[in-house]
Amino acid sequence: MRLVSWNCRKGLNSRDKDKKLLELNPDIALIQESYHPKKFKDDIQYEEAIWVGEEKENGLGICVLSLSKDYQLSLLVDQVKYEWIVPISVSGKENFTLIAVWTQRMNGLSYGNVLYAAL
């Protein structure tokens, strides 16, 4: 299983970024600071995706690439307490809990302390 996490600064908004991601051949990609995955579905051809964020151009996308149809994603909670720390159930070839993270300062806490508080 290959998992890639990438803060790609404003999503996969260029063919260069799409190509670089696909060259890594991930089964699952966590894309921080991302456009909504619908915007790049034709370019990376993911099988399914979860996305969190208030803006359509700035969020956290978690995608199963269509090269690997071995995994399914589902949120473990109805409402995420910390917007950028998302617990996900991954099922399929292997079953596990994935905590997708895009750390940001919140309420005066540093990146690390936000993650620590969420966990």
Which sequence ranges carry the predicted segments?
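Structured beta-strand-rich core segments of catalytic domains in phosphoester-bond hydrolases
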Residues: 34-106
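A conditional alpha-helix N-cap/helix-loop micro-motif detector
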Residues: 10-11, 78-79, 112
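Short, low-complexity, polar/charged sequence segments that are solvent-exposed and flexible
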Residues: 22-26, 50, 82-83, 117-119
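Active-site-adjacent loop/helix micro-motif of nuclease/hydrolase catalytic cores
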Residues: 13-15, 108-111
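N-terminal, active-site-proximal structural segment of metallo-dependent hydrolase catalytic domains
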Residues: 1-44, 51, 56
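A long, amphipathic alpha-helix that forms part
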Residues: 109-119
